[in-house]
Amino acid sequence: MHPIRHAKALVRERLTELVRSEVRAEMRATATLAAQVVEARQADASRLASTYDHTKNPNDEFYSGLADRLRRAGVDVQTRQVDVARFADWVEAHAGLGAYYGDSATRVEKLLEHYLAGESTHLTAGMTYIDVAAAGSHWVPCLRHAGLDALSLDLSYPQGVRGWRIGADAQKIPLPDGSVDAMSAQCAFEMFQGGADVGFISEAARLLRNGGGLAIVPLYVDDTYFIATSPYTVVDPDSFDEDATVVWRDDEYDAPFSRHYSPEALADRLGDTLALFSQVRVVHMTNLESVRERWPGSRLYAYFMLESRK
């Protein structure tokens, strides 16, 4: 065969193999999704996240009980209240950030998470700060405008450090030891699959300077240790914690993975790694009802925040 014809034949053969491989993979994924959707629709209450997820119907007394269980598990728990007047002033001063969240029921919750993280880590001009799993958040641009050397980190960004964006796994951040003053994760930590929750805390301890702070808000603590997954996504079964109950999401969100610790699981799973910090506490916010009264109709669930200092 002529060399050019032979080369063309090899290319066609290779392309055909690639297409067939992609089609087979897509068919397998589609079949898996279809089976999951059927299973989720037929599942009884014991297999549905709404049975276990108390953030959908918050109860202050319930979360106070969880705080007591955390203490019995050996966790340092500090009660704290949102200064509603001060937070209202902050919301007004960050109107642009509020506009990003629109008129959703979680708008005030999202703003509260940023506010609490900033208060916890004492963010001020000149500090180096990383917003972990930032995705499309406008928080870092706000902080940069205020004079901070603020950086956004997300796995979805192009890999490497590119200006103020870092594309990397939160367990392997390409920055030197002790180069960061503060870090926080807002409504993100619960989505860290497999051992990434433990791995991230270890990485934060490496990156933070002595005295630097880490805030994780909300810290999802619930009565039962469970992981919620969407039937509309395919998750590697090995990423589910062995001792957690795995349930189907039955809300409007399609997030593939959301981990809620029980008080005992939190202490057992994270305790050794958190020992890398000089100070660790879980902050229990006890007056979210007052925030709801100020902004009626808001869905609030930042009852707990993990606050650590290097």
Where are the regions a protein language model picked out?
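Extended alpha-helical heptad-repeat/coiled-coil "stalk" and oligomerization rods
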Residues: 1-51
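Class I (Rossmann-like) S-adenosyl-L-methionine-dependent methyltransferase catalytic domain
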Residues: 7-10, 42-172, 215-310
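Short amphipathic alpha-helix with an adjacent loop that forms part of the alpha/beta core around
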Residues: 172-178
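A conserved beta-strand element that flanks and buttresses the S-adenosyl-L-methionine
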Residues: 184
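Short catalytic micro-motifs in class I SAM-dependent methyltransferases
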Residues: 187-191
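Short N-terminal helix/helix-N-cap motif within the alpha/beta-hydrolase-1
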Residues: 193-195
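A short glycine-rich, Lys/Arg-flanked "PGG" loop and its adjoining helix->strand segment in the class I
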Residues: 198-213
